[in-house]
From Swiss-Prot:
Its main location: membrane. It is found in: Cell membrane. Has multiple subunits with at least A(3), B(3), C, D, E, F, H, I and proteolipid K(x). GO terms for biological process: proton motive force-driven plasma membrane ATP synthesis. This is A-type ATP synthase subunit E. It holds the Pfam family vATP-synt_E. It comes from Ignicoccus hospitalis (strain KIN4/I / DSM 18386 / JCM 14125).
Length: 208
């Protein structure tokens, strides 16, 4: 009969249990670690994905802002260019008008040719209508001579424009003798028409 050594058996059993328990614990820990790593990797991917999305969103937002700012800057530049155009054009206009007034004031040959030209144009427009030509006091003598010289028979009178309560810088303001029609051939009207005609050319000359 074999004598059972309980002490040894217990010791061996205890050792086995400890090993088995340790193995199970290690297994559980290993599984837990793997699960944790898996979760961590998933979260890491999620975080990375979110980070990429966030970066792309930031870049997209930044691009949108830059685009908006560029559009705003472009609009501001265009606005300033337009303002500059107007300023330069206004200076050209003012200088041209100043010269026109000087020509009229000095009654230069160029102004006299202009006066003759508009007087004939007014007479032609009036046709069979008899008209009274109203001019500046300084131009009365010259215009009366032109009417005779050019044989403008429908221009029946030449008077000072102030008689009808008007003031002009030059040229001729005609009125039908019946009083129903006015013919505007003043220096002011001619200058306005000239501006509309040469405006594009002036802008081109200014580099726009």
């Amino acid at each position: 009969m074999v004598k059972v050594e309980f002490a040894g058996d217990v010791k061996n059993l205890t050792s086995y249990i400890e090993k088995d328990a340790k193995a199970k614990i290690d297994s559980v820990v290993e599984e837990a670690v793997k699960e944790a790593e898996k979760l961590l990797n998933e979260k890491k991917e999620e975080l990375l994905e979110r980070a990429v999305v966030d970066v792309e969103k930031l870049l997209s937002d930044a691009q949108a802002r830059l685009s908006a700012e560029k559009s705003s800057i472009d609009m501001e530049v265009r606005r300033k260019v337009e303002e500059r155009k107007k300023e330069l054009f206004q200076k050209v206009v003012e200088e041209a008008w100043k010269r026109a007034l000087e020509e009229a004031e000095k009654k230069t040959e160029r102004y006299k040719k202009f006066l003759e030209k508009v007087l004939i144009a007014m007479s032609n427009e009036a046709g069979e209508d008899e008209v009274i030509a109203y001019v500046r006091a300084d131009d009365l003598e010259d215009v009366r001579a032109m009417v005779q010289e050019k044989g403008l028979k429908n221009v029946v009178e030449v008077k000072d424009v102030k008689e009808v309560g008007r003031e002009i810088k030059g040229g001729v303001l005609g009125k039908s003798k019946s009083g129903g029609v006015w013919y505007n051939y003043t220096l002011e009207k001619a200058f306005d028409e000239l501006l509309r005609e040469v405006y594009p050319k002036v802008l081109e000359a200014l580099g726009f």
